């Protein structure tokens, strides 16, 4: 080709014939060869590994020459075999062919080192490897849900005993050495995720981007024979390529016309969106890493009316966690209250928070609830929990006393709090008193000294209750608000990734479903591409096409489209032949 | 009270209609000539669809929130989505094999919802504080739609597997007789893929040609429905993550339900990747999708059955308190 080029630049059409055709042949070869390149690939890997072991075994300098020979041999085989996927990126680019030759001849130690990253890339972008990674991540995650997470070692000694191993081999030793007791932060799992991330990058770099480039390249076929050799071909007597072009455009093809030649393809959008999906995944992974290494978390239960400082609650989670100015903010819980359904169940709980800076100035005030957090200076405060901290009780117009409430353990998810008002001599060993129980801030159940039920009072009702001659008024029930605080620098990145992922998934679906109406063109990476060539040959048009998927449907579609091409009546024939010659 | 009666009536109408539709489907399977019956079964599915819509709307009105807050409601919603998936090709005047999957699916989910273990769950319940968010509609509807579409697609893939395996066994037998030479399964697949059907000389009989076409159709429809399901699942998981960042304090908590949804997502991502690879396409992708069927059920049902994690709302547990 390089020899031919300088001799033929006189007419542009001739130039095209000789320049474009080989690239196209190369492309088609690549597509056809794909099933075979795979097996070669795996051979490659073995070979490259072999050569590496040789290098490491023979560290003696005397064997250097043998080593180099070895490398040469392996390098040559590797290049010729692994070339197709990489070459597809370069060969059509025009000048790419010139570069290819020196690489082949100049295989030495240096060349080997130069090509090493490329080989690593080729291994990493290997699809079966990526599938294996995804599969093992899925299995690890499933294991993580089956094995109870974050328990003490004794728990695993009991659950996975050595005497009676699960499936014959699975004991606590496996769980603890592999870190499956904290699966989602175990080195095995994180390593697998990192590997998948690297594979994603390699695949995007070596396979997807070059294929998208190839898809954009125009290649016309200028001989009728070449077109007839396509998987699908047809001969339309009395037709014009222009008409065909219009019809193809209507069917969603990108159409390029030059003189009598037509080239049309579709499936380009379906090629760019997978790149977007992969980039979005990488963005999410990056954001998650940032979250894991650079965030602060903490939770606190604050009774109504008390304060806390943000910085005291938050604890760092990774080495990138750095405190900010906002950590000095003081938070005051103005009020904690709950909403109830008519049936008495809790509907929602709210906390009225005020934020003060170092000078004691109120910088923000907001009532938060579940699903409605407060955000200030990168800190987010969530309403997550509640409890009852104290009862304000008046006894015979004395007080009010603050009685601390303690959580009582009952089965089920319901909460129960209780307190005790001693009656009589407080210092006696078996002191008796009035018990008060509360499920929520709505109503308090009172029991007398014998433990008999007396009645129910609502706080704030000011309605006294008479127990053994004592007048008890429950003034108020003071709740405490369970807050969770966090700073997370990864969230914007992750959200950007979410947005991108959603968009690109939609795009790849839409781009492909729009085509699917006609041709089944596929979803991920190097798939779903149909090409059509046509050539005006006198009054006839020769049409050829190929696709890499759904051949039957492609033929069906093309037949439908070709039926639409209008037949040219005699009078306009002369005009057509003009076009053909011009 | 009127709402409850209405709901009762609608449940029973839709369930009996869908049972009749199933019977008609079986009849048309046995006897091909009943074109009129096929049409009436389509009308039956339309009736089911409207009944289920009515059921969901009634529940929405009297409970005051979107009726997908517990297992019973989500099962009804699931069968509603199945009936939608059934309707769409019908309106596009496409006769396809999807309907043989969607109609029984509607039947089974609805049957389970109305008859199964869940009788005490029929009363609609109040929403716990964490569920009171606009995200509920987006997240749950997307997830359930995703499950429905993915279930349909994976069932189609399973059907493909069954048909392919039957075919391959038969062909291998033939080859043994004629050529005294057996082909590995993959090789036959590969040859089938590689050769254009119209120039197909390897399997000249028309019977094999129709089979091949059936397999292609199953593959095509399975892929279409799976890709839309995957889209829904992606949106569902992402909206769930955003919601979790509003309600639970983090966008990802490794909660069992969350994890299984991610496993489902990964499995179907593997499906789409196997399909693009020419070496692995066809059979292998169908196998992956069939695995996906099990995974979806574990995710949708199994996790709630265990009653663990943050997602254990409105489900029944096997261990009673």
Swiss-Prot record, chain B:
Keywords annotated in UniProt: Chloroplast, Cytochrome c-type biogenesis, Membrane, Plastid, Thylakoid, Transmembrane, Transmembrane helix
InterPro entries listed in its UniProt record: Cyt_c_assembly (IPR002541), Cyt_c_biogenesis_CcsA (IPR017562), Cyt_c_biogenesis_CcsA/CcmC (IPR045062)
Membrane topology: Multi-pass membrane protein
Source taxon at top rank: Eukaryota
Signal peptide: none
Subcellular location: Plastid, Chloroplast thylakoid membrane
One Pfam family per UniProt: Cytochrom_C_asm
Record keyword Transmembrane present: yes
The keyword Isomerase appears for this protein: no
GO molecular function, one term: heme binding
GO annotation, cellular component aspect: chloroplast thylakoid membrane; plasma membrane
Function of the molecule: Required during biogenesis of c-type cytochromes (cytochrome c6 and cytochrome f) at the step of heme attachment.
Alphabetized PANTHER family for the sequence: CYTOCHROME B_B6 PROTEIN-RELATED, HEME EXPORTER PROTEIN C
Family the UniProt entry places it in: Belongs to the CcmF/CycK/Ccl1/NrfE/CcsA family.
Protein name (Swiss-Prot/TrEMBL): Cytochrome c biogenesis protein CcsA
Lineage: Eukaryota, Viridiplantae, Streptophyta, Embryophyta, Tracheophyta
